């Protein structure tokens, strides 16, 4: 193992750089999964373009921190400008304002904190968890990403106040079930607070019906957050925007540019319709960060949890300029075409099954030898996936769907 190969303590004297690189080649690289490999089909697409890698390299070398606008004006202004470019590419209206977080986990946590405070009239900011006499309820799909559940816990809602809403045959959240759950909580004296919908679930790329969910959210005063971490990138392709029809009814949405779009990790873009809720919750203004331009500029420390910020916008800016919108659209269309082709091959094969719709580039499939079912089929699925992953020839992701093991394959292995 790597731990056994490394010394138990740091060297007292510096070592030659060649020796460090030698250890990278001999010790580190054999223990890594190569996410940039052309046959890496696992987890989710996260292939960083060369232009974004170079932008990230420059950002690290510059070493600037976005504590405030004044600490590095170009950092704040490039982020604001670049995210407005991306907003236009996604087809979002000018009412949306963006900020870069690290991952979708943080973006969803920020959204639920904002939802909590708006619902409680900011009582929890003033009085903590004791400032609310009735439980605040969060509604999520049974197929929502695990980060949504974690965000609700970290935001203080409590596991007992998270409602898992049933899905339909396409694994999308059922609005009727959501409405029933809201009515039950109102009857019980609870306070419905937020609903997290998903545009492109992790396991099946299911598309929750945002327009119907948004109508319910507005009717009952719920904050609607949309997790479109992976699928959101597809909205730069105009013919895909039907997938998030109703997005303008949402209060916030997350799109991970470090996934399918091709920006080097990490670069999670969080858009919010009314930034005052975000700023009111996150704002800090110690004397050593104040300047004469406060109130005239966007201080990004008030748009998220950390005080310090990396210059993440630089790698996004590099990629957008080097690639251009048309090339990015062409790459995503290629990936979706490849997924449709592969889905046709799976459907045509008698010993393979396709287990969910393929709206984008994710396939849920299973190899089914004749006469094999149940636990034997589960064991077979896990075994062939593990053999493939161990071979180094390709990488796929085993997962559970409807209580049975399947395999996820993403057809976007290279930019």
Language-model features: where?
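Conserved small/polar residues in nucleotide/adenosyl-binding loops
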Residues: 410-415
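Alpha-helical scaffolding segments of alpha/beta enzyme cores, especially the outer helices
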Residues: 211-215, 341, 383
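Active-site C-terminal subdomain of aminotransferase-like
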Residues: 245-350
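A generic structural signal for well-ordered alpha-helical segments
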Residues: 152, 217, 346-347, 388-389
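N-terminal entrance/gating region of PLP-dependent enzymes' catalytic architecture
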Residues: 1-95, 386, 390, 394
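Conserved PLP-enzyme active-site core in the AAT-like
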Residues: 103, 107-279
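Conserved PLP-binding catalytic core of the aspartate aminotransferase-like
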Residues: 354-388
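Conserved PLP cofactor-binding pocket of PLP-dependent enzymes
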Residues: 357, 362, 390-408
């Amino acid at each position: 193992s790597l731990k056994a190969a490394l010394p138990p303590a740091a060297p007292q004297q510096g070592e030659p750089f060649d020796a460090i690189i030698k250890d990278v080649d001999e010790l580190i690289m054999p223990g890594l999964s190569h996410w940039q490999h052309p046959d890496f089909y696992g987890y989710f697409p996260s292939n960083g373009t060369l232009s974004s890698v170079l932008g990230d390299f420059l950002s690290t070398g510059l070493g600037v921190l976005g504590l405030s606008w004044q600490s590095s004006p170009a950092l704040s202004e490039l982020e604001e400008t670049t995210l407005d470019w991306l907003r236009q590419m996604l087809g979002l209206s000018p009412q949306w304002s963006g900020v870069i977080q690290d991952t979708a986990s943080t973006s969803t946590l920020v959204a639920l904190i904002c939802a909590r405070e708006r619902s409680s009239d900011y009582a929890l900011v003033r009085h903590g968890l004791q400032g609310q006499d009735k439980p605040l309820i969060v509604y999520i799909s049974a197929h929502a990403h695990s980060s949504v559940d974690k965000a609700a816990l970290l935001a203080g809602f409590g596991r007992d106040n998270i409602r898992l809403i049933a899905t339909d045959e396409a694994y999308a959240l059922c609005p009727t079930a959501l409405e029933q759950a809201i009515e039950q909580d109102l009857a019980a004296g609870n306070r419905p607070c937020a609903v997290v919908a998903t545009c492109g679930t992790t396991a099946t790329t299911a598309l929750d019906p945002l327009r119907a969910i948004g109508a319910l959210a507005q009717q009952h005063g719920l904050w609607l957050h949309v997790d479109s971490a992976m699928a959101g990138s597809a909205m730069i392709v105009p013919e895909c925007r039907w997938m998030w029809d109703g997005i303008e009814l949402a209060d916030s949405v997350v799109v991970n540019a470090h996934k399918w779009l091709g920006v080097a990790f990490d670069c999670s873009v969080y858009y919010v319709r009314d930034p005052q809720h975000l700023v009111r919750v996150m704002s800090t203004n110690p004397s050593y960060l104040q300047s004469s331009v406060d109130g005239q500029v966007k201080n990004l420390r008030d748009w998220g949890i950390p005080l310090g910020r990396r210059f993440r916008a630089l790698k996004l800016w590099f990629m957008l300029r080097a690639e251009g919108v048309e090339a990015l659209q062409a790459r995503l269309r290629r990936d979706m075409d490849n997924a449709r082709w592969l889905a046709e091959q799976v459907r045509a094969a008698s010993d393979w099954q396709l287990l969910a719709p393929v709206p984008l580039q994710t396939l849920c499939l299973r190899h089914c030898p004749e006469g094999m079912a149940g636990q034997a089929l589960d064991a077979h699925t896990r075994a062939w996936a593990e053999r493939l992953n161990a071979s180094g020839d390709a990488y796929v992701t085993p997962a559970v769907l409807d209580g049975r093991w399947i395999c996820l394959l993403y057809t976007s292995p290279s930019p």
